[in-house]
Amino acid sequence: MTSYKNNNVISLCIMGDGGVGKTAVTIQFISNHFVYYYDPTIEDSYRKQCLVDDQVYMLDILDTAGQDELTAMRDQWIRSCEGFILVYSVTSRSSFDQIQFFREQIIRVLDSDDVPIMMIGNKIDLDDERQVTFQEGKDLARCLGMSFMEVSAKNRTNVEEVFNETVRIVKRKEDPQSHKPSKDSDSKKPLVNTSKIIKKINTRVKQTKTSICKMM
């Protein structure tokens, strides 16, 4: 039976708007299959062993609800985790707009803006229904200091890579000399004029949103 050192057990929290496929992404990673129908999640937890850069880790994964009325519970979930995966659907502009809300909540609860966060755009298999471009996702992630990938829970595209890269992000925060960024993920290098990027991403974004990027 494999035993794990404390620093080889990593707690991850999956957050995002309702209906974006958080559970589908998680179950695809855990069980290698796609769930078409499931009841709305309040809180589910999973464990899986993974190998990242020749190191074995045990991931404790918390799949959370997206409903606004569960904000108090979400604060508790945030405090219990080391890394975060924020999910939106590329077929839903409103879920993309909510990403910054979830990021702000993490920063508020942990009282730090140096938090390991991976942002992912799910449902890229539904290209005909796409409302958010890859470039928009990439630009917002860079602006807010997050890594970024697009995935398909249905086809398993990039699902394993997302979790592996999130492990690297968490470990880099613990030890900046370890786990160099992979070629598949975006660096956290800020853009020069991030306020213009936010405006380009979504002309409906309020001034309160752009102010965060200006401060970075």
From Swiss-Prot:
<dbReference type="GO" id="GO:0007165">
    <property type="term" value="P:signal transduction"/>
</dbReference>
<protein>
    <recommendedName>
        <fullName>Ras-like protein rasW</fullName>
        <ecNumber>3.6.5.2</ecNumber>
    </recommendedName>
</protein>
<keyword id="KW-0342">GTP-binding</keyword>
<dbReference type="GO" id="GO:0003925">
    <property type="term" value="F:G protein activity"/>
</dbReference>
<comment type="function">
    <text>Ras proteins bind GDP/GTP and possess intrinsic GTPase activity.</text>
</comment>
<feature type="binding site">
    <location>
        <begin position="63"/>
        <end position="67"/>
    </location>
    <ligand>
        <name>GTP</name>
    </ligand>
</feature>
<dbReference type="GO" id="GO:0005886">
    <property type="term" value="C:plasma membrane"/>
</dbReference>
<dbReference type="GO" id="GO:0019003">
    <property type="term" value="F:GDP binding"/>
</dbReference>
<keyword id="KW-0378">Hydrolase</keyword>
<dbReference type="Pfam" id="PF00071">
    <property type="entry name" value="Ras"/>
</dbReference>
<feature type="modified residue" description="Cysteine methyl ester">
    <location>
        <position position="213"/>
    </location>
</feature>
<feature type="propeptide" description="Removed in mature form">
    <location>
        <begin position="214"/>
        <end position="216"/>
    </location>
</feature>
<keyword id="KW-0449">Lipoprotein</keyword>
<dbReference type="InterPro" id="IPR027417">
    <property type="entry name" value="P-loop_NTPase"/>
</dbReference>
<dbReference type="InterPro" id="IPR001806">
    <property type="entry name" value="Small_GTPase"/>
</dbReference>
<keyword id="KW-0636">Prenylation</keyword>
<dbReference type="InterPro" id="IPR020849">
    <property type="entry name" value="Small_GTPase_Ras-type"/>
</dbReference>
<dbReference type="GO" id="GO:0003924">
    <property type="term" value="F:GTPase activity"/>
</dbReference>
<comment type="similarity">
    <text>Belongs to the small GTPase superfamily. Ras family.</text>
</comment>
<feature type="region of interest" description="Disordered">
    <location>
        <begin position="171"/>
        <end position="193"/>
    </location>
</feature>
<keyword id="KW-0547">Nucleotide-binding</keyword>
<dbReference type="InterPro" id="IPR005225">
    <property type="entry name" value="Small_GTP-bd"/>
</dbReference>
<keyword id="KW-1003">Cell membrane</keyword>
<feature type="lipid moiety-binding region" description="S-geranylgeranyl cysteine">
    <location>
        <position position="213"/>
    </location>
</feature>
<dbReference type="GO" id="GO:0044351">
    <property type="term" value="P:macropinocytosis"/>
</dbReference>
<keyword id="KW-0488">Methylation</keyword>
<feature type="compositionally biased region" description="Basic and acidic residues">
    <location>
        <begin position="172"/>
        <end position="189"/>
    </location>
</feature>
<feature type="binding site">
    <location>
        <begin position="122"/>
        <end position="125"/>
    </location>
    <ligand>
        <name>GTP</name>
    </ligand>
</feature>
<keyword id="KW-0472">Membrane</keyword>
<dbReference type="GO" id="GO:0005525">
    <property type="term" value="F:GTP binding"/>
</dbReference>
<feature type="short sequence motif" description="Effector region">
    <location>
        <begin position="38"/>
        <end position="46"/>
    </location>
</feature>
<feature type="binding site">
    <location>
        <begin position="16"/>
        <end position="23"/>
    </location>
    <ligand>
        <name>GTP</name>
    </ligand>
</feature>
